Every structure is written in C-alpha cells, then in structure tokens.
C-alpha cells in the first residue's frame, strides 16, 4: 500500500540518515574485507535511492504533484552525495556504489514507466492517395 508523499519524504529522509550514520559508525568494519567493501557500495546505492526519493518527494510537496526529478540536478546531486559518503568509508565503496546505483536507477526507471506511462493508442489511418 502506498503512503502519502509527505510520509514518504519523512521515511526516506530518516532511513537515508540512518544508513549514512551506520556507514560512518561501522567504517572500520566495512573497510576490513573485500566483501564488506562491496556491501558498503551496496549500502551507498540505497543511500542514493533514498536521498533521491526524499528530494523528489520534497519537490512534489513544495512545487506540486506534476513535478518530476530530472537527470540534472536531482539525480546528479544525490549520486554525488552518496559517492561522497561512500568515499569517506573506502574508495572501492564509491566505485561499487556507482555500479549499484546506475543499475538501481535503470530498474526504477523501468518500473516507473510501466506504472505511470499509459499506452497511447496509435491511429493507423492510411488515407487515400490522390491521383495526379
């Protein structure tokens, strides 16, 4: 069941702050092994998705329901922020964060297009050709 935009804004913001603080608290553990570093990048991609959700919901609350997040500045700003957060933990976390974030953004875009873009019927009328 979907929640209202304002509730989604609060939930995404709080969860993003919790993920950021957990990454900073467990920085030595995340940087200790290769798998933990990849997991840190995965957490960073969740930070990206949640911050993008929060920014998009904030724009929807302030600017109206029809507003959509664009590649620049919303997506770029959130990606740079999550890369900065991952880079403070480990450099490889930032690299894997890019990979996971791009993949997540692709699938979220596909789901969004399926849900929100209704197919438009195409008019296939050929018409009569004039003889000269």
Swiss-Prot record:
Keyword Nucleus: no
Transmembrane segments: 1-21, 35-55, 69-89, 92-109
Chief location: membrane
Topology with respect to the bilayer: Multi-pass membrane protein
Highest rank taxon of the organism: Eukaryota
Keywords, sorted A to Z: Membrane, Transmembrane, Transmembrane helix
Membrane is among the record's keywords: yes
Gene Ontology, cellular component aspect: extracellular space; membrane
Annotated compartments: Membrane
Sequence similarity: Belongs to the KRTCAP2 family.
Function description: Subunit of the oligosaccharyl transferase (OST) complex that catalyzes the initial transfer of a defined glycan (Glc(3)Man(9)GlcNAc(2) in eukaryotes) from the lipid carrier dolichol-pyrophosphate to an asparagine residue within an Asn-X-Ser/Thr consensus motif in nascent polypeptide chains, the first step in protein N-glycosylation. N-glycosylation occurs cotranslationally and the complex associates with the Sec61 complex at the channel-forming translocon complex that mediates protein translocation across the endoplasmic reticulum (ER). All subunits are required for a maximal enzyme activity.
Name of the protein this chain belongs to: Protein KRTCAP2 homolog
């Amino acid at each position: 069941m979907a929640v209202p935009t304002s509730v989604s804004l609060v939930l995404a913001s709080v969860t993003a702050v919790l993920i950021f603080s957990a990454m900073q608290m467990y920085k030595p553990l995340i940087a200790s092994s290769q798998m933990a570093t990849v997991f840190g990048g995965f957490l960073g991609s969740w930070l990206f998705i949640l911050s993008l959700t929060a920014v998009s919901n904030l724009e929807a609350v302030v600017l109206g329901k029809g507003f959509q997040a664009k590649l620049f500045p919303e997506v770029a700003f959130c990606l740079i922020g999550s890369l900065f957060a991952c880079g403070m933990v480990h450099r490889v976390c930032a690299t894997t964060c890019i990979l996971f974030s791009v993949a997540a953004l692709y699938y979220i875009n596909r789901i969004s297009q399926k849900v929100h873009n209704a197919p438009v019927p195409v008019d296939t009328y050929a018409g009569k050709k004039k003889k000269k």
